[in-house]
Amino acid sequence: MGFNINIIGTGGTRPLHNRYLSSVLIEYNGDNFLFDCGEGTQMSLRKQKISWQKIKMICITHLHADHITGLLGIVMLMSQSGETRKEPLIIAGPVGIKNYTKTNIDILKIYKNYEIIYKEIIIDKTEKIIYEDKTKKIEYTRLKHSIECVGYLFIEKDKPGKFNTEKAEELNIPKGPIRKTLQDGKEILIDGKIIKPSEILGESKKGLKVAYITDTGYFKELIQQIKNFNLVIIESTFKNELKKEADKKLHLTAGGAANIVKQAKVLKTGLIHFSERYTLRKDLENLLKEAKLEYPDGEIFLTKDGMRLEANKNNFIIK
């Protein structure tokens, strides 16, 4: 349970023997959300002993192969794991995600014993919130890439403050569901008097905010979207020396990624989506150095396949 971030893969373009394609799984009190699903994602999930059957929603950033070719394998496995899936699978992504998935299910004659709910995103037209419940929501944000591409914002809702039992007794609020109503942030009526949650509850606790941002070139609008986020997982495809190539392909350099999170005053930043040309650890360390030179006051780290981060107060701790 809890609020955890699992790094499923960290590479771009093609999987390497020690680095699968970029993918992140967020666990939140038993609900699992997978972001991107390139080739080999199921292998990485298996290595990390994460059940694909527990994935509630898969969010695809865009329809390039290195972010989507593992999707059909996950869809198939959910019907072949020996247990019947009890709830629908939600698949979200830019326009085309539904056609891609349904067409391949039909062509490959994939047996499926559960419902899939598709949420296709028409950028700047679809409602920003693509998932919401009592404790959290997921929003999309436009990115700047060679095809339609979105980033995802996982936002934990503020938690209500401590319930003041003594005050509740003073106001003759009976124990039971009516107190729960106040804890849910709703007013109640007692003896003809309206009682507001603020009269009974202490100061609320700010929810944590996590962003998954890949693939994109630099653009200012993104900065405001991730302002003051607790954790941003952002692409760092190239070294700074390849800025021209990065700009042409609409990707970010390490310095470019750091510049964005610096302006956004992000608390903690994980670099991801490393070019296949960087196979040595020292290459990745150089990416990190370039990012830290741009944002020396920032808490920046290299993501790694199999890494896990756990929420701790207003931060995420690498375990």
From Swiss-Prot:
A Pfam family hit: Lactamase_B
The organism's place on the tree of life at top rank: Bacteria
Record text on cofactor binding: Binds 2 Zn(2+) ions.
Cofactor(s) demanded: Zn(2+)
MF-aspect GO terms: 3'-tRNA processing endoribonuclease activity; zinc ion binding
UniProt entry keywords in alphabetical sequence: Endonuclease, Hydrolase, Metal-binding, Nuclease, tRNA processing, Zinc
InterPro entries membership: Metallo-B-lactamas, RibonucZ/Hydroxyglut_hydro, RNase_Z/BN
Entry binding sites for Zn(2+) 1: 62, 64, 145, 215
Catalytic site positions: 66
Reaction equation(s) it catalyzes: Endonucleolytic cleavage of RNA, removing extra 3' nucleotides from tRNA precursor, generating 3' termini of tRNAs. A 3'-hydroxy group is left at the tRNA terminus and a 5'-phosphoryl group is left at the trailer molecule
Amino-acid positions noted as binding Zn(2+) 2 in the UniProt annotation, renumbered to this chain: 66-67, 215, 273
Keyword Transferase: no
Cited Gene3D superfamilies: Ribonuclease Z/Hydroxyacylglutathione hydrolase-like
EC numbers, comma separated: 3.1.26.11
PANTHER family membership: ZINC PHOSPHODIESTERASE ELAC PROTEIN 1 (PTHR46018:SF2)
Quaternary organization: Homodimer.
Function: Zinc phosphodiesterase, which displays some tRNA 3'-processing endonuclease activity. Probably involved in tRNA maturation, by removing a 3'-trailer from precursor tRNA.
Family named by the database record: Belongs to the RNase Z family.
Official protein name in the record: Ribonuclease Z
Native species: Borrelia garinii subsp. bavariensis (strain ATCC BAA-2496 / DSM 23469 / PBi) (Borreliella bavariensis)
